[in-house]
Amino acid sequence: MKLRANRVGEQMKKELGDIISRKIKDPRVGFVTVTDVQVSRDLQIATVYISVLGDEEQKENTLKGLAKAKGFIRSEIGQRIRLRKTPEISFEFDESIGYGHRIDTLLHEINKEGKREE
């Protein structure tokens, strides 16, 4: 059953990217990348992880815009993916990209310090 949830999540990820970039006209929604979609085993709840280009204010405005368009997005998903019931959607920021960048920066600093000591 977990395999089906993963397949639905991947399909939703692809469709959400298209819907957010082409169908949503809210000016608060800026450049958004859907990084992952986690769907519950019973296919009732979908958590959408997004990455937003911009500062904290832009991120918050984007989240508000997506929350406002949640019903429209869910209906579009329902039309594009054949399921008995379209999952309830919630949006969250994907912090893993920021963590990865921070780790990369730290590794570069360690590497520079190691070269200086030699």
From Swiss-Prot:
Entry superkingdom: Bacteria
Pfam families noted in UniProt: RBFA
InterPro entries: KH_dom-like_a/b, RbfA, RbfA_dom_sf, Ribosome-bd_factorA_CS
Gene Ontology MF terms in the entry: ribosomal small subunit binding
A single cellular component GO annotation: cytosol
UniProt record, GO biological process: maturation of SSU-rRNA
Record's keyword terms, sorted: Cytoplasm, Ribosome biogenesis
Localization per Swiss-Prot or TrEMBL: Cytoplasm
The family this protein is said to belong to: Belongs to the RbfA family.
Function as written in the Swiss-Prot or TrEMBL entry: One of several proteins that assist in the late maturation steps of the functional core of the 30S ribosomal subunit. Associates with free 30S ribosomal subunits (but not with 30S subunits that are part of 70S ribosomes or polysomes). Required for efficient processing of 16S rRNA. May interact with the 5'-terminal helix region of 16S rRNA.
Subunit structure: Monomer. Binds 30S ribosomal subunits, but not 50S ribosomal subunits or 70S ribosomes.
NCBIfam families per UniProt: rbfA
PANTHER family tied to this protein: RIBOSOME-BINDING FACTOR A, CHLOROPLASTIC-RELATED
Protein's name in the database: Ribosome-binding factor A
Gene name of the record: rbfA
